């Protein structure tokens, strides 16, 4: 009854785990009505968790990866109870795997965006992720070398290891969009640059979940990210950084941002 009451449900990935708790309780108690409630909640939340491009809503690449794992498990549990995974969920989950492959650095590690640790990307998240996780030994490369995700990521890379080792490719990721909160930082407008086998511009990434920790507070701020600062101009901390133009050809990847 507690999990069925909407007022007890929180947000984001915490809500996902509550819904899964309801799935398990419903299965044990053979309560089909409660199971259907959990199913409807999962379907509704998934539409906001991953958009049609496959971008996650938490503002951190590490949480993009974790949500792929959590939701794959969630839909597997739903299937085990005899329910069908919604077609849109299948499509968005696959798009999310491809999006993660684009975001991962050429050396196979996660870019430190938002609350993300500097770790290798996990295998087993689809053929595109396996490709970057194994330096091209398994899986297959995604199509294209540049993409702009509406949820605030521009990704540009020199290639997928066809003319040189994958780890020697260049990679740039730029953040834009509105203030996401959740596990994001004040990093809109920041630039991440990897080339010649190493990261040259990187951000603070995950430090701690302790909200009163002054070091964590600093690592969330614009000052801890690769953002152009103009001291003489006023800036609104939570203002949107909009993508004014994005063009990708075989020769040029071009983007223009407007920091309000």
Residue spans of the language-model regions?
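Alpha-helix N-cap/helix-initiation motif
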Residues: 11, 56-60, 182, 210, ...
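Active-site rim segments in enzyme catalytic domains, especially the processed small/beta chain
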Residues: 184, 188-255
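Active-site lining segments of carbohydrate-active enzymes
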Residues: 1-62, 72, 130-142
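Short, solvent-exposed loop/turn segments at secondary-structure junctions
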Residues: 10, 161, 179, 207, ...
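Catalytic-loop motifs flanking and including active-site residues across diverse enzymes
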Residues: 18, 67-70, 224
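Carbohydrate-active enzyme catalytic cores, enriched for enzymes
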Residues: 23, 51, 55-201, 251, ...
């Amino acid at each position: 009854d507690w999990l069925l009451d909407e007022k007890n449900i929180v947000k984001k990935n915490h809500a996902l785990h509550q819904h899964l708790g309801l799935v398990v309780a419903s299965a044990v108690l053979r309560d089909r009505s409660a199971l259907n409630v959990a199913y409807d909640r999962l379907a509704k939340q998934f539409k906001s968790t991953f958009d049609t491009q496959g971008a996650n809503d938490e503002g951190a690449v590490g949480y993009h990866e974790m949500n792929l794992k959590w939701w794959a498990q969630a839909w597997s549990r739903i299937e085990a109870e005899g329910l069908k995974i919604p077609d849109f969920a299948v499509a968005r989950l696959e798009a999310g795997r491809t999006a993660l492959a684009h975001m991962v650095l050429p050396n196979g590690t996660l870019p430190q965006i938002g609350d993300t640790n500097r770790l290798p990307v996990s295998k087993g998240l689809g053929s595109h992720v396996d490709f970057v996780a194994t330096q091209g030994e398994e899986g297959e490369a995604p199509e294209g070398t540049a993409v702009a995700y509406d949820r605030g990521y521009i990704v540009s890379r020199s290639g997928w290891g066809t003319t040189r080792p994958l780890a020697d490719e260049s990679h740039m990721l730029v953040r834009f969009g509105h203030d996401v909160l959740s596990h994001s930082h004040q990093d809109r407008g920041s630039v991440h640059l990897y080339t010649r086998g190493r990261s040259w511009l990187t951000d603070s990434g995950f430090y701690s979940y302790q909200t009163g920790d002054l070091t964590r507070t600093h690592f969330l701020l614009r000052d801890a990210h690769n953002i152009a600062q103009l001291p003489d101009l006023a800036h609104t901390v939570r203002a949107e950084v909009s993508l004014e133009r994005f063009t990708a050809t075989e020769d040029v990847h071009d983007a223009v941002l407007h920091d309000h």
